[in-house]
Amino acid sequence: MTMLVITLLALLGFHSAAAAQDQSVTTLLTSLETRDELKPLKTVVVARDGETIAEKGYRGHTPSESTNIKSASKSIVSALVGIAIDKGLLDGPEQKIAPLLKEDLPSQADPRINDITIGNLLSMQAGLGRMSGPNYGRWVSSRNWVRFALAQPFDDEPGGRMLYSTASTHLLSAILTKVGGKPTLALAREWLDPVEGFRIGAWERDPQGIYLGGNQMAMSARSLLAFGELYRNRGRTADGRQVVPADWVELSWQPRTASRFTGDGYGYGWFTRRIGDEDVYYAWGYGGQMLYSAVPEPDGGHDVG
């Protein structure tokens, strides 16, 4: 799946006429249907400068149908945190989380829990034991996901190496629910309502009713693209409304750590990679739920796929 994206971005390079590029992408998307290694592929949508230049569904799927975008939803939770900060509901990335979640802290908590910040959760540098991969099932089988996550032993110092954990984003969802006074889904639908074409469908909740930050969110490829377009425009909608603060988009795309699996940088809910001569920022979800944004030179176009 990664090679598919690299091929797409290469075709979307800025070396030939836009019309020729558009035709190349359409041809490529058609050819993907016959590739055995891409049989799980459901849909691909590619846009350039806000215009969809090619889209295709495979094996009966369509770009308008919802699917579980998995961890790509972490980028959406990051946007909600940025909006909450802009609204004064949160102080900023350096705000400590312990006072916000004091009811769920362990009775004999490691003192380092008082050092974890909002930014640490966003960049996967909380230091707490990971609740992803082989530990995920044990976590979501617990009676209280927030308390279970906060009770994990520290594997590193807060602000240390990247420890990718869906629990970190879930703690952000719990914090948003508390400071926003509404469920995270209600906040998302209210705050991101101005984004044309964006819609969250079903979304799993924990036993306390908190929406699962960072997983189990249903969305269509077109809707995910609409979110990508919002970030392409530095948080501004097509009609000029500033939904996500522009400086938050820049902060989110600034690498703070790196994946030990790929070496790609990681900011606030977004991965970063250099492909060819382009900086690429992407939301990643298990099973190939991907949103890529390629940022060229200032006088070039901007692709989202």
Regions found by a protein language model. Give the residues of each.
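Active-site helix/loop module of the DD-peptidase/beta-lactamase fold
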Residues: 87-126, 151, 180-215, 219
